[in-house]
Amino acid sequence: MSNGKKIFISHSSKDQEYVDAFIQLLKKFGFRTQDIFYSSTIETGVQPGELIFDTIKRELTNQPVMLYFLSDHYYQSIPCLNEMGASWMLSDKHYPIALNNFSMKDMKGVISSERLAIAFNDKTSTNEINCLLKKLSHDTDVQAEPDFELNVEKNIQPFQNKLTQLIRQASYLKPDEKGYFETILSTHRPVYGTAKGVYDCFKLPSLIEPKSLGLDTLSEDESHWLFFFLTWGTFQEGEKVRFKLKKDKAYNNREFSDIGKCKNIYVSYLEKVE
């Protein structure tokens, strides 16, 4: 049984997918819907007919255990910062969680980097996650399900897999509203044979999102290479470029002994960005 203390999830709605995955892990551990306040779903958040700020005020007054999912999105949100300040005054249990690519040096306000509980990234270990769950269990008196304790690694693995998937998706190159991609050219690859003197080739630092290529998924071990006519100009590693994908054929699957599986990415427009 819970001691009445809820877990309060302070987050930006733009990071909801990360939080949704963690909520599923909390429930697998043994937390019930009524043990969690999470405003992004009706079952754990604001009920129909309620005012969100009145609900948040009531929940914070009950001195919940605070989890802050910190990101650039979080610090760009005035409601999130207000929530952080109010909870600091009303609660004595605070667990800041840094999401992927959020630097501790960017932590501001009343929650300092010295208080960081965990960073969710592709290196987060099972032991780190389980340690956080045990602290939350201690603070709320919510006990772990017997099945969870019998196989901690097996039960945490789906969350780690989802975290890795979300991090990978966040790194994808995505176009702007007009269909243009912007990136920095990475490794230059010499072109041989009949293509020499006609084409040039540079590795892209990130994969192009599957959706833009008309795909559902990408291979975990593939790389993407911009393969274009020399008539587009002379380019160097480290230069920032802007391009559009070729509509009739945006890519071609290739495989080489030195770089493995890859896609040649074809463009209909390419320019340097100063």
From Swiss-Prot:
Disulfide bonds: none annotated. It comes from the Bacteria. Pfam families: TIR_2. One of its GO terms (biological process) is signal transduction. Coiled coil: none annotated. Gene3D superfamilies: Toll/interleukin-1 receptor homology (TIR) domain. Its EC number is 3.2.2.6. InterPro entries: TIR_dom, Toll_tir_struct_dom_sf. The active site is at E83. NAD(+) binds at S12, S13, Q47. One of its GO terms (molecular function) is phosphatidylinositol-4,5-bisphosphate binding. It is an enzyme of class 3 (hydrolase). Keywords: Hydrolase, NAD, Virulence. Residues 3-140 form the TIR domain. It catalyses: NAD(+) + H2O = ADP-D-ribose + nicotinamide + H(+). Virulence factor that suppresses host Toll-like receptor (TLR)-mediated cytokine production upon infection. Acts as a NAD(+) hydrolase (NADase) by catalyzing cleavage of NAD(+) into ADP-D-ribose (ADPR) and nicotinamide. Interacts with host MYD88. The TIR domain mediates NAD(+) hydrolase (NADase) activity. Self-association of TIR domains is required for NADase activity. This is NAD(+) hydrolase TcpF. It comes from Enterococcus faecalis (strain ATCC 700802 / V583).
